Amino acid sequence: MEAYLFLIGLVLIGVIAQNKSLIIAAAFLLIIKAIGLDGRLFPSLQAKGITWGVTLITAAILVPIATGDIGFRELLNSVRGHIGIISFLAGIFVAIIAAHGVGLMKEDPLVTTALLAGTILAVGLFRGVPVGPLIGAGIAALVIGMWDIIVKAISG
């Protein structure tokens, strides 16, 4: 019963915040649970959902290449100015950080729970976009790594 109430609450937060992604995701899970397919679908969705989501986002990003709107010339021209170079480097940095985040999320379920809570808050109240768990986990992994180094240095 708690899961139903939680999902209904998320739908309501999505409605209040006018966040279609949160509404659709929570309603989808609510429907799957209500019709009794949760036992069959949730394990696969939980195990592979992030990979599916990243794949879908990647496909959406690649559409301009597939349509011919972006070719090799545009790609090369995009990194000639300072904005392009900074964006290029930011893309590299974020991808590396997110890779570390995936590992952290798989290692510790509590990290995933805390990130989920933060992401729900950001999506619901600040009109955030729920790509945050991967980046959030990557940033958390980076900060945790730095924390460990500092603690080791202090404790000798």
Curated annotation (Swiss-Prot):
Compartments (UniProt record): Cell membrane
Membrane-traversing stretches: 5-25, 52-72, 83-103, 109-129, 131-151
Protein name, per record: UPF0756 membrane protein Exig_2210
Stored Pfam families: DUF441
Record's bilayer topology term: Multi-pass membrane protein
Entries under InterPro entries matching the protein: UPF0756_TM
Top-rank taxon: Bacteria
Keywords in alphabetical order: Cell membrane, Membrane, Transmembrane, Transmembrane helix
GO cellular component: plasma membrane
Classification via PANTHER family: UPF0756 MEMBRANE PROTEIN YEAL
